[in-house]
């Protein structure tokens, strides 16, 4: 069994493998343009590692580089092996991927806890669950969420002086971000990555807001989704200082009112719960409230997102990292 870094000429074979062994309708099995958007990096390299023998692929794992360093920070993406005589092939692919990319840090949101999560946890990787926070709008009827407990932190119960200012272009965002500052974050997402990921996406449209309190140094990245003739706002990434999120409850309420959202939610790891509470959010626990995550197709259920990583210190992960926030079909 040979485990190697894929080449661009392998794209059709990897797409066919995904179609046959993951899902016939998966976007990465059917849309080459999107496959190349997500998995051909700035050096024109196809970001997959494959395991093959006698011309047949037995396993693949994709990844996304978040900066252009020699030892980059990366996020794992689709990871799949099929039955064969090679013991622990999935683990071997992961080890080869980390070696071949020379990555500093690697995190993989969206792992299956019954398969890869359990295996990697046994071999020294950190396996954790992302926190799921939400703030609901006070409505008589909810068409997306199922709300049994409408308790929310009242706007103004903490200092609510923070404001959100819409950012219309990456050039505007870039004025407030230095590469040196971005390098202090784990993972390090450089300017090239941020522009490409959120301002040049071929299918999704993202809304970027600067937090103004008292100056602009932190940014919230959101995506609007709809179902059942209703809309919500997903926070998919956050760039900045955790404490800047405090005191935004009034700003969130104003945004929900302007946009007509039922709620705003956020999956994250690394932001202290006390800060999210002071921002007006509530941590989702139990099943009394249902804050759906799946919209393609829509599923009215709560979803836990687990991740595996080789680092936890300083780590901040969000739904937009890896391929958790991408079209499904």
Where are these regions (language model features)?
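Extreme N-terminal starter segment of soluble prokaryotic enzymes
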Residues: 1-3
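Long, compositionally biased, intrinsically disordered segments
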Residues: 5, 22-27, 80, 248
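Acidic/polar helix N-cap motif
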Residues: 7-10, 82
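Amide-forming acyltransferase catalytic core, primarily the GNAT-like/NAT-type
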Residues: 11-71, 121-236
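Active-site/acyl-donor-binding loops of N-acyltransferases
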Residues: 34, 65, 104-157, 221-329
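Secondary-structure boundary elements
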Residues: 54-55, 99-103
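Conserved acetyl-CoA binding element of GNAT-fold acetyltransferases
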Residues: 71-83, 230-241
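Conserved acetyl-CoA-binding loop-helix of GNAT-fold acetyltransferases
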Residues: 78-100, 243-255
């Amino acid at each position: 069994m040979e485990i190697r870094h894929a080449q661009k000429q392998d794209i059709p074979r990897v797409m066919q493998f995904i179609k046959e062994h993951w899902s016939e309708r998966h976007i990465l099995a059917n849309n080459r343009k999107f496959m190349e958007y997500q998995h051909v990096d700035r050096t024109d390299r196809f970001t997959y590692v494959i395991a093959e023998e006698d011309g047949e692929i037995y396993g693949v794992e994709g990844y996304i580089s978040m900066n252009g360093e020699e030892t980059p920070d990366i996020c794992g993406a689709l990871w799949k092996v099929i039955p064969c005589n090679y013991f622990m092939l999935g683990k071997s692919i992961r080890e080869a991927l980390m070696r071949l990319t020379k990555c500093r840090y690697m995190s993989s949101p969206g792992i299956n806890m019954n398969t890869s999560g359990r295996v990697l946890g046994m071999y020294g990787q950190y396996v954790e669950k992302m926190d799921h926070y939400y703030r609901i709008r006070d409505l008589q009827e909810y068409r997306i969420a199922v709300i049994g407990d409408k308790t929310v932190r009242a706007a103004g119960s903490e200092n609510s002086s923070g404001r959100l200012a819409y950012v219309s272009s990456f050039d505007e965002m870039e004025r407030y971000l230095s590469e040196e500052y971005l390098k202090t974050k784990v993972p390090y997402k450089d300017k090239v990555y941020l522009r490409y990921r959120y301002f040049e996406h071929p299918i999704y449209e993202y809304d970027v807001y600067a937090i103004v309190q008292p100056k602009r140094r932190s940014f919230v990245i959101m995506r609007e989704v709809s179902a059942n003739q209703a809309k919500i706002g997903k926070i998919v990434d956050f760039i900045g200082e955790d404490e800047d999120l405090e005191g935004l409850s009034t700003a969130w309420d104003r945004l929900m009112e302007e946009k007509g959202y039922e709620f705003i939610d956020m999956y994250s790891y690394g932001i202290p719960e006390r800060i999210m509470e002071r921002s007006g959010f509530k941590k989702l626990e139990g099943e009394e409230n249902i804050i759906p995550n799946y919209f393609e197709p829509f599923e009215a259920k709560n979803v836990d997102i687990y991740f595996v990583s080789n680092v936890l210190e300083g780590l901040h992960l969000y739904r937009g990292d890896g391929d958790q926030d991408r079209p499904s079909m």
